[in-house]
Amino acid sequence: MSSERVLNYAPAFKSFLDTSFFQELSRLKLDVLKLDSTCQPLTVNLDLHNIPKSADQVPLFLTNRSFEKQNNKRTNEVPLQGSIFNFNVLDEFKNLDKQLFLHQRALECWEDGIKDINKCVSFVIISFADLKKYRFYYWLGVPCFQRPSSTVLHVRPEPSLKGLFSKCQKWFDVNYSKWVCILDADDEIVNYDKCIIRKTKVLAIRDTSTMENVPSALTKNFLSVLQYDVPDLIDFKLLIIRQNEGSFALNATFASSDPQSSSSNPDMKVSGWERNVQGKLAPRVVDLSSLLDPLKIADQSVDLNLKLMKWRILPDLNLDIIKNTKVLLLGAGTLGCYVSRALIAWGVRKITFVDNGTVSYSNPVRQALYNFEDCGKPKAELAAASLKRIFPLMDATGVKLSIPMIGHKLVNEEAQHKDFDRLRALIKEHDIIFLLVDSRESRWLPSLLSNIENKTVINAALGFDSYLVMRHGNRDEQSSKQLGCYFCHDVVAPTDSLTDRTLDQMCTVTRPGVAMMASSLAVELMTSLLQTKYSGSETTVLGDIPHQIRGFLHNFSILKLETPAYEHCPACSPKVIEAFTDLGWEFVKKALEHPLYLEEISGLSVMKQEVEQLGNDVFEWEDDESDEIA
């Protein structure tokens, strides 16, 4: 009896979770799972041939590919199916009854095992992902169960059977998805069959332990299923097969026969939670904030709050169409600064500033992208650089350019022609154009060019205690009537409004909060409009899409208006579009120097003559009537 001993077991695996595993878990949580905390499948391929000599168990490596349904395995690797339960709240993770949870997973393995003994092996991970701090709490469990009657009380070492071990190793290499095999009456290795093993009483198990003469705890699962299949089995030969050296054989004895052989829900002892690095039965915590690329963290963090909108509030919100929109900001002043900050908060990645001014000493307190040290430097380039400091992955560009203005005579035709060409090229390159410049006449040429290129225009303009935010209508609109642009209410062509102005007229004198209100509404109007392009309908998950928003701070009121395009509009009427198409820069040059030329082309001059004639006719009629009465 001195050679008899109680059979002990080693832990089944030692887990190694790669950073890519947590990155993929983060992506799935944000983009796919959201509030879904149900079981998600995992797949691992075990390499039983290349186990480090210092390891006591087979490493269980989990990477981003572990989430793939078709996880391509290499030669000699053993596929293992598992699952992960990612909780929404840290307290749910902490308060989970871990033993009950593992017992439930063990019952699932048991039910699979009595159908196919090779299916009684699995693993499970419980986790919580703190996506703001990049801290991940997790605990690996490998359900190992043992029925009281299947306890192996005494084992007796069997002399080395190298030839048999070699045959088993080769069989497992070919049958890579199998965990057990048996010997038949002819001493041939065959698939597990309870009728055969009842007679031969030889069971071979693929092992994941490297400890000398100590099998992994997974052995308990196979022995429990074996005794369920052969309830009267007491003595048998157990072969522990390792792909490298270390295989051994035992003459084993069950504690007793199985009185519960017909029970599908047996009394079982369950273990399998992995110990942490301190050797305690407790979860592990991984802080990836110091390991990941800061730029990668910034990129994911920028999108975090936006993606959380889709979890519960706006599941149909299309964030990609916003992120991929290229935005051109004409004006890098107060409006341009606030609009750009709202755009990057919505996830826009491509912004181009156009401005020809420099930062004055009065600007930094009202224009959020500039500091005192920036005074005297070009606005456009500084605004772009400031956005990149806020978010280094931002594709921000600054272009110093003077927009040719109607009513302002040409000073340097060659330079202004180049500015015109550059402006038109910029409008072609971008998807949405924001008009955020100071003067009315500087909005005319961008409005015309955007209409020519069928670009979406968002216009924002400020008064002292009022603001206007509007979207321009396009020629390709599906509706029967085209919406008006910024100039559709004009009865005269824009003229020079900058010359001979006093200081209070030259500076933008507004209540400080007006610019913030107009800027935020302009960006929100853009995001709502983009959702209609995605859905193809007038309704949007973000609500209404007004044409014009006029706000008045003196009584804190807001009006939503809609006006059609004006047939004599100096910026978007068909005659103006046709003239520009035919003449190009020559048309623009004439309009810049002679605003009345634009009135003639658009038909405003004829309209004014008709109105004047109508007025004369009315006065003549009144005179005739007065004569008759007299």
Swiss-Prot record:
Q: Which GO terms describe its biological process?
A: autophagosome assembly; autophagy of mitochondrion; cellular response to nitrogen starvation; piecemeal microautophagy of the nucleus; protein modification by small protein conjugation; protein transport
Which Pfam families does this entry report, sorted A to Z? ATG7_N, ThiF
Instruction: Please report, in chain numbering, the residue ranges of the motif GXGXXG motif.
Output: 331-336
Q: Name one GO molecular function term.
A: Atg12 activating enzyme activity
- The organism sits in which domain of life? Eukaryota
What InterPro entries does the entry give? Atg7, Atg7_N, Atg7_N_1, Atg7_N_2, ThiF/MoeB/HesA, ThiF_NAD_FAD-bd, Ubiquitin-activating_enz
The protein's UniProt keywords, in alphabetical order, are:
Autophagy, Cytoplasm, Protein transport, Transport, Ubl conjugation pathway
Transport among keywords: yes
Q: Which sites are catalytic?
A: 507
Spell out the subcellular localization from the entry: Cytoplasm; Preautophagosomal structure
- A GO term from the CC aspect: phagophore assembly site
Q: How does it assemble?
A: Homodimer. Interacts with ATG8 through a thioester bond between Cys-507 and the C-terminal 'Gly-116' of ATG8 and with ATG12 through a thioester bond between Cys-507 and the C-terminal 'Gly-186' of ATG12. Also interacts with ATG3.
The entry sums up its family as follows:
Belongs to the ATG7 family.
Function, as annotated, reads: E1-like activating enzyme involved in the 2 ubiquitin-like systems required for cytoplasm to vacuole transport (Cvt) and autophagy. Activates ATG12 for its conjugation with ATG5 and ATG8 for its conjugation with phosphatidylethanolamine. Both systems are needed for the ATG8 association to Cvt vesicles and autophagosomes membranes. Autophagy is essential for maintenance of amino acid levels and protein synthesis under nitrogen starvation.
Domains as described in the record: The C-terminal 40 residues are required for homodimerization, as well as the interactions with ATG3, ATG8 and ATG12; and the C-terminal 17 residues are required for the ATG8 lipidation. The GxGxxG motif is important for the function, possibly through binding with ATP.
> What is the protein name stated in its UniProt record?
Ubiquitin-like modifier-activating enzyme ATG7
Gene for this protein?
A: ATG7
